[in-house]
Amino acid sequence: MRVVHLSDLHYGPRHLEEADRCFSAAVDRAIELAVDVAVISGDATDHALDLHAPAALRLLAQVRRLADHCPVLMLQGTWSHEPPGTLSVFRMLGSRHRVFVADRICQVALMGSASPRDLSVTDAAAADLWLASEGPRFAEVPPGARAVFTCIPSINKAAVAAAVGATAAAEAQGEQLAQLLQGYAGIQGLARAAGVPTLAVSHGTVFGCVTEHGVPMAGFDHEFTTGALFSTGAQATLLGHIHRHQAWTQGEGERRQCIAYAGSIGRFHHGEQRDKGFLLWEFGPDGVDCRLEPTPARRTLDIVFEGRPDMDQLREAVRAQELAGVSVRVRWTVADEDRHEVDRGAIERALSGAADVQLEGRIVPMVRTRAPGISQFVSLADKVRAWATATDVHAPPLLECLERVTTTEPEDIVAEALAPQADEVSGSDA
């Protein structure tokens, strides 16, 4: 059995061209590979979309095209990206194969013995190939099941906090999910003994995973650990949420288990590392395996200056690169007093051949040192001594000037400042 695993499509106005180009290419490739079933593991949209919005129409068209080829399972992703109910419209597509929307914790079986590519367009059996459990899991493997999917949608952390308290929510979430996942081991074992492929689908963060920008995720509020996910007994765990493809495995042959993020379908931000694409999962007598199928994600280029942008270096970088179709980000770091010396217009003109240009300047604020306890001193001389100590300045000349300012009349100070110096007078006489 072949399963195509797509994730984090993020359809919305901001990323529409990138998302649609990459997802369309992925659907084309999935049809070419003759996959048996497709899984979208969350965040199909970037935020709530109006049904008449171009992003919604394009997403519906692509999912319909995919569902005309094979059954499709769509999982509820992050609530801020896919508010509850966002995916409900996909149940009504009327495609050749029904789209199953997993918006609750459940198990669902892919039914039927025939491969979708062997069914005729008029075959009624193709219209409804999904059987969902009434509760969180099946009591037994449904007869005729071709595969069993364990669906764990994105967790509403606010609900967890309301139940156990905000301070305990982070650890309680992980503990409750770990217990839930362990409870699936029994039914997964029965399915595997019957030769039925077992898959888990979820959306969240695995402790120790790495983001698309190369940052390890090692906090205490992450949903999963690899141990908890392996404890389900599923052969394959299809994950969404992290935009970088990565995988963990254990066991060999028929006992092999694999956990994998597909990563985002496209490159939505600057600095994202590695290829973008989707996963092709293959189940056979030798176990399960997956591989990344790349999509035509956009190319990005970062040009970084430690100080003010050097236009000569920038032009040299432009000559060394083919900028057509490339998204360029220029970053620099300058002191607060030099911020107005950066010519943004000149930078944009130098990069006019790029698909788009993003300018990011980091301003280093001026830091004024304040002597600790200076406000507690009564005399101005004591305050000057404290400041000189804090700033490592030689104090006696400052104190001499202070003495003159406080003990001499202003007219005398001005007259002395305007009077010619002794050496100047002697020089003129010579």
Task: Enumerate the language-model features and the residues they cover.
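Core catalytic region of metal-dependent phosphoesterases/phosphodiesterases
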Residues: 15-112, 131-137, 226, 230-234
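Active-site environment of divalent metal-dependent phosphoester hydrolases
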Residues: 12-13, 46-49, 75-86, 108-111, ...
